[in-house]
């Protein structure tokens, strides 16, 4: 029997805990930043953006897409933040898509059909989650968040594309306020 893949990470956790790395961590992010990005390990925002513990809230999913669940998460954090920050801006949501995204496979009919069967989803609903042109998809997702009625107008949203080849994140949709709320 081989050791579990998590064993090395658990050992590093013990070192982290013994060193007190968790002490003083805050619930509300230090940078007032909420990052939505892909679950691809090449796009780890702690490394790509140089984030430390407590700097940002990070939500990761296939393609870094703004789904209803992600919108609900932003709305929840916004409502919590309104309690802690009675006036002024609450936080910025940075939507980050990336080049060479595996979510592009959702554009392939055969792949999408098999995946839909596997997860029990409507195949037609999955096509819109494909990331073939990250500039276009991040722009779409930023607009989706900005027009979501459940999100506070004190939240700002921006859109970015991370190039996995050169390692740079480029802003493609400048920061602006949520329209609704």
Could you describe each region identified by the protein language model?
Residues 1-29, 64-66, 72, 76-90, ...:
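Divalent-metal-activated hydrolytic enzyme cores
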Residues 19-75:
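Conserved beta-strand-loop surface patch within small alpha/beta domains used
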Residues 36-38, 60, 94-98, 160-163:
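Short beta-strand segments
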Residues 39-42, 99-103:
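Gly/Ser/Thr-rich loops at beta-strand to alpha-helix junctions
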Residues 55, 92-93:
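The start of beta-strands in P-loop NTPase/AAA+ ATPase cores
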